Structure formats: C-alpha cells, structure tokens
C-alpha cells in the first residue's frame, strides 16, 4: 500500500512540474501588454515588462523569440544590470537612453547550470531608461548603432 501511495505522489509531482514548465515556457506571454519599438528603420513588436515580477522573469524559460519581436523594459534613468538566469537562447540587449541607443550587449549566451552568484552580469551605460531584448545578432544584422534613433510606438503604454 505504501508503494502505491508513494508512486501516486511521485506521479502527481511529476505532472505538476510538467504543467508548470509548460505554462512558464509558452511564448509570447498573453498576460503582457504589447507595443512597438522602432530603431532607425527597424520595427519590433514587443512585450512590455511593466511589473517587478515581469521584469525579473523577462524571457526566462522561453525557448525562442520570433524574428522582429522582443521584450521592452522601462526604468528610471540609471545603470541597468541584466543576467541570463534561466534563459534558453542567446539575445542582444539594447540599452536605450531617452530616444537614442546608448549601447548594447551582443550575443549574450545562456549559462545553464551556472550558480546565480557566478552568472555574467551585463551592465548598461549610465542614464539608460529602457532595455530592449531581441534575438542574438539583431544589432549587427539590422545595423543598430549607438546614437540610432528610438521611437516607442503609439499605443505602447507602460
């Protein structure tokens, strides 16, 4: 009897973990607001990470991003720090100050199995108030440069 109960509990826990993983790995997240960001002639459809929880989670657990999409974070101006915790694919991080690209971290790689305290921290220049995460190599492919103009599309509400 004990074995049956134990096996049942294990199966239930495995099922709960599997469902939890499916929920966290779906993309895009329908509970996030969406908008548009233009950098030069490039237009990105973005999900808006507006709450602390959404910003902490970011793109973690997802398996990919569709080309031309990304996630936009908005902050008070300052130095922003990002990491690749629980990420499954490489990204470019575009640092934005006001309406201009202030810099970027290109081809940031996932670090599976690396303890939190050893994860690489990607640090923006000072004065950054927005960060756009996009697929790796987007900065190079789309010729995004420091000083490129940035426009947050109409209807993109934080």
What annotation goes with each model-predicted range?
Residues 2, 16-158:
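Compact, glycine-rich, soluble single-domain proteins
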Residues 1-12:
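N-terminal Sec-pathway targeting helices
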């Amino acid at each position: 009897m004990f074995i049956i109960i134990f096996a049942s509990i294990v199966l239930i826990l495995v099922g709960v973990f599997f469902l939890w993983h499916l929920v966290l790995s779906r993309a895009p997240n329908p509970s996030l607001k969406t908008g548009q960001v233009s950098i030069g002639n490039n237009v990105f459809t973005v999900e808006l990470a507006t709450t602390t929880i959404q910003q902490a989670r970011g793109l973690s657990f997802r398996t990919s991003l569709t080309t031309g999409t990304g996630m936009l974070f908005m902050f008070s101006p300052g130095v922003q720090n990002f990491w690749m915790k629980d990420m499954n694919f490489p990204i470019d991080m575009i640092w934005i100050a006001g309406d201009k690209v202030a810099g970027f971290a290109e081809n940031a790689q996932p670090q599976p199995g690396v303890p939190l305290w050893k994860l690489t921290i990607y640090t923006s220049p000072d004065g950054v108030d927005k960060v756009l995460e996009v697929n790796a190599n987007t900065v190079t492919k789309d010729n995004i440069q420091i000083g490129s103009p940035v426009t947050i599309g109409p209807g993109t509400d934080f």
